[in-house]
Amino acid sequence: MWSGLLPPGLNESDAESNSEDEATLENSGLNLQEDKEDESIRKTEIIDFSTDEPKTETESNVNAYEECPSGIPIDMWNKFQELHKKHSEQKSTTSRFRGKRRKRSRKDKLKNEKELHSEPSSNETQWKELTQYFGVNDRFDPPVKRKKVEKSGLEKRIDQAVEEWNIEKAEELSNQLATRELGVKIAKAVACHNFVKAKKEVENSQAARKKKKLAWGFEAKKRWETKSNMGYM
């Protein structure tokens, strides 16, 4: 409603029509809000009902499993439930035992791998110690020109196999010759290693004996000299 005068270009009939239109718009807006609220309430009810359904189904299944069905005696049903519980407990224990066995097998594998890695390392250290003495005494050997080279029986057999074009036999004999030469080198290196070790032990024992001997101090030496001089007085 207009208080006072109307604006220019408007009549009372126009003002009444405008007020009626505003009222209808307000009523329609209220109706829309009410419809939206009703829809939201319905959606929440549907969601609650859907969430409650699986719980009720699971509970009903559990109750149906625990309850004795019709036509079966109660004693038999109780025995069946006890057997079912024992079976489930056995499954759980077997699964735990398998897990422990797997852990043990993994630990055993790791131990074996560590042992395998440690063994080659010790062998490698021993081999390095021996390789230091390879060819140590070669300088004492006479030169090749003055040496009377005499072929061994194995070398003669290799030459014979080569002349007969028997390559496989020649390769086998050459491998045997190489292993023999390597064995000789290793034996010489071991002898040198043992000699050096024994020499070091003797030197260390001599040094320890020298340390045990009491060294003459300046004052002790002076006293000894004075005592010896007093004997001649």
UniProtKB/Swiss-Prot annotation:
Keyword terms: Coiled coil
Biased composition (Basic residues): 97-109
Region (Disordered): 1-126
InterPro entries: FAM204A
Residue ranges of coiled coil: 144-164
Skewed-composition ranges (Acidic residues): 13-24
Basic and acidic residues: bias regions: 39-58
Organism: Homo sapiens
The organism's place on the tree of life at top rank: Eukaryota
Lineage of producing organism: Eukaryota, Metazoa, Chordata, Craniata, Vertebrata
Keyword match Coiled coil: yes
Protein name in the entry: Protein FAM204A
Record gene name: FAM204A
PANTHER family with a match to the protein in the record: PROTEIN FAM204A
